[in-house]
Amino acid sequence: LGMGRFRGGSMKIAVLASGLFGSVSGSAVANVVGTGVITIPMIKRDGYPAHKAAAIEAVASTGGQLMPPVMGASAFLMAEFLAIPYSTIVAAALVPAILYYVALFIQADLEAARMGIKAMPKSELPAGRTVIVGSHFVAAFAVLIYALFVLRWQPERAALLGAVALIATSLVFGYQGNRPSLKALFSSLSTTGHSVVEIILISAASGLVIGVLNVTGLSFNLTYALVEVGGGSAIVLLFLSAIVCIILGMGLPTLGVYVLLAALVAPALVKVGIEPIAAHLYVLYFGMMSMITPPIALAAFAAASIARSAPMATGWAAMKFGWSAYVIPVLFVFSPTLILIGEPFEITIAIITAGMGVWLISAALAGYFSTQLTPMTRLLFGLCGLLALVPAGAFEGAVWSDLIGVAGGVALMALNVMRNRLAVRSEEAA
């Protein structure tokens, strides 16, 4: 209802819906298939090219695996691996995930502006009551969050309380006059059990893989090889690790991706002094990027089959829309302020400048901000965005990079807004 009132509403609705569903689905491809059959035709109907409609769906669905509090169930395993509270994992993953979706929303908005796509017609917008009718189901989610972060309960105990709250609200309020029968409740429990069994099997199989890797020494050898080839350079090691993560992550569900990479790649990053939580989030991000990175971008290709677009064109468009996921992990590795490690003031500044950087780079990629951007202006937007993205604590003097990037970005934005207003006035005068 709210998104549809603005330009590019269909694409923004797809981003929101796929992100929410993807955070609990545990599979980017399953999320694309589940939500894409609705969102992709809706986006195409608004006038977007088929490959862009498929790409935005693939990127939004993949990002759901990185969005707290569930993160495709990988957050729970990460807490076990690192022996730290689950709430710490969720807090650390929150800002990077928000920046990911902010970049996606901005690109959706600017693409709509560049292509002249208007808001959805009022006749197609749902009535406000349609949204309000099911709002009581949010209570169960609120109970879950309260139990996890306020009461500090273990995830399994908090999930049980959330399930009880969901059943209670269903029985008391129902939905559109319908309340679940006892048979329907038992059927839901059975379906949930089947889903849990899949997760247990994946975790058990992953445990066997880790055991074999440790017994054979392959885990140690890969860690040693990465560190040696990297030659002590963190930048080279991060680049090599990203490639390994993308290759190993191809075709695996989220849990499988994380467990494999946490055992094989993360130790090499920790060995050179990278924060353990930053290292584990780094491998998770690049493992999930295998879903939108050609040549085997399974989520992008699944979306392409629904949109009937060219698979490779969809894959490259998905990489463009999902650019932030290739950059943000590198930033929080060099400066953990983006994962809320550091002084409150430094964290605040890092978040603000990163948000500005995301906006500028998204505008450069879209080629639009208030008006069409020339190639040189796009280059300047991108350069200022990169400078603003660098966290102040990344290296000595990085604060000047932030200041130059933000100041230059604000100046470019102001100039483009003024240019657009002058052009509009000239047209009106003519």
Locate each region found by the language model.
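Long, contiguous bundles of hydrophobic transmembrane helices that form the permeation core
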Residues: A91-S195, L298-L389, L422-E427
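Membrane-interfacial loop-to-helix junctions in multi-pass transporters
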Residues: G2-A14, D46-K52, I132-V138, G193-I199, ...
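Transmembrane helix-loop junctions in multi-pass membrane proteins
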Residues: F76-Y86, F149-W153, V212-N221, G249-G251, ...
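Hydrophobic alpha-helical transmembrane segments in multi-pass membrane proteins
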Residues: S10, A14, S18, G64-A73, ...
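Hydrophobic transmembrane alpha-helices
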Residues: A17-F21, A60-M67, L99, V209, ...
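Alpha-helical transmembrane segments of multipass membrane proteins
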Residues: G19-L20, T62, A73, L77-F81, ...
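Hydrophobic transmembrane alpha-helices that form the pore/transport pathway of multi-pass ion
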Residues: L1-G64, S74, A83, T254-F286, ...
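Core transmembrane alpha-helical segments of multi-pass membrane transporters/permeases
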Residues: L160, K183-F220, A234, L238-I247, ...
